[in-house]
């Protein structure tokens, strides 16, 4: 069994908690940095983010042992999050809540509304409103990747 399959098995123990890692894994966007029975550290290349899932702080530290630097990281509990923040000097690392829509059919969009990717013409607006990351180069990359979306009504971004 290869490392990606072993990582998947670990993450599928709690698929809702690790939805942010399983999605990129399914899309072939991650590589396994380190893997143990008690956790996994992935690197999401397009997102330029390390993604840590660990059963304990000790496991998290061991999984990160070979990583010299991180600029963007996610963790799934406060203790390993605090470790990443302190070890890699990530002052913007903070808690978040995830939600997942698990149905196969997309939610209906009311008449007159549209969800669509945002292009470079929306860069300034994204930079002002996207508080998680304020690095302009990162935002340009995410726009180019087609992963920034907006809700429009009558052609106007809401």
PLM feature segments, named:
Residues 37-38, 156-158:
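Glycine-rich acetyl-CoA-binding "A-motif" of GNAT/NAT acetyltransferases
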Residues 61-110, 114:
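Hydrophobic alpha-helical segments and helix pairs
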Residues 1-19, 95-137:
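Short amphipathic alpha-helix that is part of the acyltransferase structural core
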Residues 1-68, 78-81, 132:
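N-terminal charged segments
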